[in-house]
A protein has these predicted regions:
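Bacterial Sec-dependent N-terminal signal peptides
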Residues: 13-38, 109-126
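Solvent-exposed, low-complexity, repeat-rich "mucin-like" stalks and linkers
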Residues: 21-26, 33-64
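Surface-exposed binding patches on compact interaction domains or structured appendages
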Residues: 53-89
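A short beta-strand micro-motif common to beta-rich folds, especially ectodomain repeats
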Residues: 88, 98-110
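Active-site and donor-binding regions of nucleotide-sugar-utilizing enzymes
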Residues: 131-170, 174-309, 464-467
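Donor nucleotide-activated moiety binding/catalytic core segment of transferases
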Residues: 192-201, 423-470, 489-493
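A nucleotide-sugar donor-handling region in carbohydrate enzymes
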Residues: 272-382
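Conserved catalytic-core segment of nucleotide-activated headgroup transferases in glycan assembly
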Residues: 356-371, 381-422
Length: 503
């Protein structure tokens, strides 16, 4: 289907393995059936294993993907071998320039096949990828991914578990969106497993077509192990994989505090999580024992240490909300590559045509809501509501709304955004003159980001929305003080002098 993830076929790795002949003669296996060896830009040695039913030989292919016929950066310890098991030591000189590759031709028993060796360029950054992969579960990472996808023109492969977040048919043609059976709901565990295998196959296809390709992975920080599982574990050199770990929202900050907020366990926890990551085979691929359900891709404890490794970064709304008073963890925080990027900044930076495409992807009617804000010359104020478990809670919310209208109604048009589960506010427009009720079921984050220049004040019940809103836009909160807020809102608002605390 147009704009949907194409059905990916498993590559027959004929370039690395001779299949059994029709008469049943044994096959030759190169590197246990893989068809390439990928290493970083440093001077390194690797191995190619050969398991052959007859004597074999290996030569450099004349074309070598545009390189010299006999590159001086690649040395083989043997150019022929006997039947049975053999090993070839492959030595790479340090690469001071662009990525390079060469094709080795193995001949055995009258059959010839190619094996690719490649060496990455040094110093490539997060803007270097030739192909992008986006995998997300939470809403916030999905929105980040959609915004970034529209900021470049590279081929992209996309999966988001909350299928209703975007309309897959509205993605650009260069983006292949993995389909789900229920586009109004969530991807099933079976669909996530199938998606993962399809993504891994596509990565190997791209590597076979373009052995020096650089990959970009944008992934929930809670699923950051996919940077290893999908790429490095399949043999792709980690320097060719630029991983942006996207904040899942409050979980990013709360998990950091839970893991490293206790001085008695913080250092041990950090070292334990670091040891798990470093136990992986980062130089040549391999497989770390899987200790989690594969359909969840979970790696909650890894993103913080991973952000200290090359080619990994943690992108979040506000890095200053990650803090520690313990010297050991404070030092580790300083070593973490964190980028504070607000989604509205990504949206603002897009060309107008790309903004409109994002709104279509997100099923957001910009013109409709912008029109509401332009109906009068007054400034615009939004109140954020909450859910309720009692009549008293419903009455308290109504009292807050009445107070805000009395306090600001003469200078502001008042808009109320109910919680999706709140039905008590349905009668507010009749009860409170001049109040406009916004839809409870709407992409509210996108509403705020898209119309930020038209929103003069926002406030209400504590919400994760405030993490991605400029602090100077927040005028009031329905709470006693910052200390009573959940993390990281307690840190965000502890020095906010402009916020009025209402209880």
């Amino acid at each position: 289907m147009k704009r949907l993830f194409r059905l990916l076929l498993i590559l027959g790795l004929a370039a690395g393995t001779w299949s059994c002949a029709d008469d049943g003669t044994p096959s030759v296996s190169i590197n246990s059936g893989t068809d390439f060896l990928s290493l970083d830009h440093l001077a390194r040695s690797g191995k190619i294993t050969v398991n052959a039913p007859a004597p074999w030989s290996v030569t450099l292919a004349p074309e070598n993907y545009g390189q010299d016929e006999k590159p001086d950066w690649l040395t083989l310890s043997a150019e022929e071998g006997p039947a049975g098991y053999s090993e070839i030591d492959v030595t790479f000189a340090e690469n001071p320039g662009p990525a390079r590759s060469a094709s080795l031709l193995f001949t055995c028993d009258g059959k010839t096949s190619a094996f690719t060796v490649s060496q990455s360029a040094g110093g490539t950054g997060f803007d270097a990828p030739d192909y992008y992969f986006y995998i997300s579960v939470g809403t916030m990472p999905t929105l980040y991914s959609g915004l970034h996808l529209l900021s470049h023109d590279k081929p992209s492969y996309v999966s988001y578990e909350r299928a209703s977040t975007f309309d897959a048919a509205e993605f650009p043609n260069r983006a292949f969106v993995y389909p789900v059976a229920d586009p109004t709901g969530h991807a099933s565990n079976e669909e996530l497993r199938a998606m993962s295998e399809a993504m891994k196959r596509r990565i190997l296809e791209i590597n076979a077509e373009d052995p020096t390709a650089v990959f970009g992975l944008w992934v929930d920080d809670l699923r950051c192990r996919l940077g290893y599982d999908w790429f490095v574990a399949q043999g792709i050199d980690s320097a060719r994989v630029k991983v942006t770990m996207l904040s899942d929202g409050t979980a990013t900050y709360n998990n950091f505090h839970n893991y490293f907020g206790d001085a008695a366990t913080a250092e041990q926890n950090w070292n334990d999580y670091a040891a798990e990551v470093e136990a992986l085979d980062w130089n040549h691929g391999g497989r770390y024992p899987e200790t989690r359900a594969p359909e969840e891709f979970a790696s909650y404890t890894w993103p913080y240490y991973l952000s200290t490794r090359p080619d990994y970064r943690l992108m979040l709304q506000n890095s200053s909300l990650m803090e520690s008073s313990y010297p050991f963890i404070a030092d580790r925080l300083a070593a973490m590559k964190m980028e504070s990027v607000q989604p509205y900044e990504l949206l603002t930076a897009l060309p107008e045509a790309s903004k409109q495409q994002f709104y279509r992807m997100a099923k957001f009617d910009y013109a409709r809501f912008a029109g509401l804000f332009d109906l009068s010359p007054k400034k615009n104020l939004i109140i954020i509501g909450t859910s309720h478990s009692s009549a008293a809670s419903e009455q308290q919310q109504a009292a807050y709304v009445e107070r805000i209208i009395q306090q600001y109604g003469s200078d502001y048009d008042i808009f109320f955004k109910p919680h999706p589960a709140d039905s008590s506010s349905a009668g507010y427009p009749d009860r409170f003159e001049g109040l406009t009720l916004l839809p409870g079921q709407m992409p509210f984050e996108i509403f705020v980001w898209a119309l930020l220049d038209k929103i003069d004040m926002i406030g209400g019940y504590p919400s994760t929305t405030f993490i991605s809103v400029p602090l100077d836009k927040v005028g009031f909160l329905f709470a006693a003080d910052a200390d009573g807020l959940v993390r990281p809102l307690n840190i965000l608002f502890r020095d906010a002098a402009n916020v009025e605390w209402i209880q």
